[in-house]
Amino acid sequence: MMIGLLGRKIGMTRVFTPEGVSVPVSVVEVHPNRVSQVKTAANDGYSAVQLTGGIKKSSKVSKPVAGHFAKAQIDAGDMQVEFRIDSEDAFTPGQVISVADVFTAGQYVDVSGLTKGKGFAGTVKRHNFRTQDASHGNSRSHRVPGSIGQNQTPGRVFKGKKMAGHMGNARCTIQSLELVKVDSERNLLLIKGAIPGAPGSRVEIKPAVKKQARGE
């Protein structure tokens, strides 16, 4: 099973193909990830590798967490993620994994992150509801959702009803994005299209589960 890496979204730009076609790409900075723990089926019930990225001030790390990183003889990170693996033999605590070890240009990846938070939003913005009439007897009800239920039967609002509420700041995964370029010198990945999150936010990049690179 392939593992992924942790990185930070830098922003978006574009690159040009040899034919002169403009390709929009998201730039992700992926500094070498460090293995903080290797979980085994014998000790933990399943096999997984735990990675950390970035650097966190020692004053911001609790003693139990500091001891966890010290056991692997690595600096405390400000990002952490776990990937399931088939065999623990390829990983050891303290091991450093770079972008060139996992990704190659042309393959497809899945990117997970937190979407931009939009705060409290109405149904028009949050769920793409249509607005009501601007005139013809409509008074101050242009953006209201309308009826949210039936009558005495069932006498309640069904779960999952689309209503106003908090929008964004939710985990989201965009699948099967093409990896345009891997810049191992600057620890950058150029991924075709948009990915979740604001610039500077944490993202997880994994080999795509539904699509392989061209020619494979």
From Swiss-Prot:
InterPro entries tied to this protein: Ribosomal_uL3 (IPR000597), Ribosomal_uL3_bac/org-type (IPR019927), Ribosomal_uL3_CS (IPR019926), Transl_B-barrel_sf (IPR009000)
Keyword set includes Zinc: no
Annotated keywords: Methylation, Ribonucleoprotein, Ribosomal protein, RNA-binding, rRNA-binding
GO BP: translation
One of the record's GO molecular function terms: structural constituent of ribosome
Pfam families with a match to the protein in the record: Ribosomal_L3 (PF00297)
Cellular component GO terms, alphabetical: cytosolic large ribosomal subunit
Full protein name: Large ribosomal subunit protein uL3
Organism whose genome encodes this protein: Legionella pneumophila (strain Lens)
